[in-house]
């Protein structure tokens, strides 16, 4: 009965979604997986099939994916844990589901532990599947989220290892794929197992201050509500509390107590666009309405409406002085922007069909990752660190002389910019002009800089370049050339000796 109830809940989630109704296909995948895992129990004592059902529910309800992903989630452990093969899956469910299940089977296991290098290679495979089908990595993140939610039944040593791995790679990946709420939950769950005392301390503080926060929010929201209603807007306004992990991070990095963190809660306004009015303009209309009521802090305006983040995130952020004399951050988003902020890449697909546009920054990021993965560098652990560098950094926006915008990680140099244009330009780069001023290759860039790259045919990548480039692409390209040169020198000296 427990199994049937779990599956019925999954079907209900699916029928509430916007996807085409393919209930028979999902039922067939469930029956196949249920029979394949029959009699097997999880460590918690419940039937094993409850895990694939839970992963499929995350994929459907929290990521907004359709029947292909739901079926693949239901079948994701069949090839690894039972006698069935990828060919059996292909015969029963077709090429696409077989390809996704195959991708998920290849990347089972962790990335830390005795076989760290082999497991890092696993992760390399995982990221390579992103360029073939992003759904592989989305289902892998859903699988990890369910394992984290049920980590309590594991031995403490295993809990610690899985939590560390989640914080190191899966949370940053979820962030980069725009899965904001999943990223936050993965961080908080990892933190709970890695630092239980600190987790309990901050959770207790949040609970103790909840009532006063709610009163502050009501006081703050009343005049804003009145103003927005008078403008005829359909919207919802709610308070969003910072996660336990991000509060702890701020306490650690700033060296402050819980009581000294002023932005523990933010206000989010999500509106349904008025017909015929541009979404961006409506964001700024709401901004105007709020700044008529409260004093703004000009250095805290963040316009991700005109220039979305690389993971697709769009919103207008501002910070104002609330009625109680505390600074309050406000995030203004349309319903579409909110969907993309919460469901990330999955929601991108939904909206991309209707808006034909060039590749998003995320598509470009996936392309960069693919280039790095395909470079013949044998050291998979170095590669993991390189990827990690580029997963969690903030972005800056830099202009070419023709006015094209390039997105780079914070701290990127003129040489990183040259490699972002093309690897040949990077290899031949001798310097740059930033805002018409001559600078060295190591010059760090800032948002809004205009950069012109200077090249020379006789230039070759130098080993010291690795000391100051920050992007994974630049590092991989420089490494590849230096290795090739070392091999050629080695061969030449062998020939001389002969």
Where do the protein language model's features map onto the residues?
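Structural motif
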Residues: 19-24, 46-49, 62-65, 129-136, ...
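Short, mixed-charge amphipathic alpha-helical segments
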Residues: 13-29, 85-97
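Internal insertion modules embedded within essential enzymes
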Residues: 3-7, 86, 94-97, 104-267, ...
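Active-site flanking loop/helix segments enriched in acidic
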Residues: 17, 29-58, 108-126, 402
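Short, well-structured alpha-helical segments
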Residues: 23-34, 49, 70, 98-105, ...
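Generic hydrophobic/packing signal
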Residues: 59, 63, 77-82, 93, ...
């Amino acid at each position: 009965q427990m199994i049937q109830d779990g599956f019925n809940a999954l079907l209900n989630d699916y029928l509430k979604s916007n996807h085409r109704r393919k209930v028979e296909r999902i039922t067939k995948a469930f029956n196949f997986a249920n029979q394949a895992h029959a009699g097997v129990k999880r460590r918690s004592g419940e039937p094993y099939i409850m895990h694939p059902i839970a992963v499929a529910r995350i994929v459907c309800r929290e990521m907004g994916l359709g029947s292909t992903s739901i079926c693949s989630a239901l079948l994701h452990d069949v090839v690894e844990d039972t006698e069935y093969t990828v060919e059996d899956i292909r015969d029963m469910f077709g090429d696409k589901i077989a390809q996704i299940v195959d991708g998920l089977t290849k990347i089972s296991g962790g990335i830390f532990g005795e076989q760290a290098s082999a497991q890092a290679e696993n992760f390399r495979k995982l990221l390579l599947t992103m360029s073939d089908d992003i759904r592989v990595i989305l289902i892998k993140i859903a699988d990890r989220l369910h394992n984290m939610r049920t980590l309590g039944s594991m031995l403490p040593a295993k809990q610690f290892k899985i939590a560390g791995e989640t914080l190191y790679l899966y949370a940053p990946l979820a962030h980069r794929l725009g899965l904001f709420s999943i990223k936050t939950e993965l961080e908080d769950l990892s933190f709970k197992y890695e630092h239980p005392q600190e987790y309990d301390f901050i959770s207790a503080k949040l609970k103790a201050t909840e009532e006063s926060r709610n009163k502050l929010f009501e006081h703050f929201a009343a005049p804003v509500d009145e103003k927005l209603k008078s403008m005829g807007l359909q919207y919802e306004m709610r308070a969003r509390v910072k996660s336990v992990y991000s509060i702890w991070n701020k306490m650690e990095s700033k060296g402050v107590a819980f009581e000294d963190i002023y932005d523990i809660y933010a206000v989010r306004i999500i509106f349904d666009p008025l017909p015929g009015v541009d979404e961006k303009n409506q964001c700024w209309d709401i901004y105007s309405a709020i700044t008529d009521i409260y004093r703004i802090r000009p250095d805290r305006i963040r316009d991700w409406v005109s220039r979305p983040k690389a993971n697709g995130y769009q919103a207008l952020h501002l910070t104002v002085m609330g009625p109680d004399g505390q600074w309050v951050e406000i995030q203004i988003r349309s319903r579409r922007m909110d969907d993309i902020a919460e469901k990330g890449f999955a929601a991108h697909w939904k909206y991309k069909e209707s808006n034909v546009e060039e590749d998003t920054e995320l598509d470009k990021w996936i392309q960069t990752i693919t280039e790095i993965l395909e470079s013949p560098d044998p050291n998979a652990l170095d590669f993991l660190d390189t990827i990690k560098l580029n997963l969690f950094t903030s972005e800056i926006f830099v202009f070419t002389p023709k006015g094209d915008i390039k997105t780079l990680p914070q701290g990127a140099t003129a040489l990183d910019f040259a490699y972002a244009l093309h690897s040949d330009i990077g290899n031949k780069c001798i310097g740059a002009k930033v805002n018409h001023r001559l600078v060295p290759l190591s010059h760090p860039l800032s948002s809004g800089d205009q950069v012109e790259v200077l090249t020379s045919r006789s230039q070759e990548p130098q080993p010291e370049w690795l000391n100051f480039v920050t992007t994974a692409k630049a590092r991989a390209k420089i490494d590849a050339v230096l290795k090739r040169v070392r091999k050629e020198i080695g061969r030449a000296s062998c020939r001389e000796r002969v």
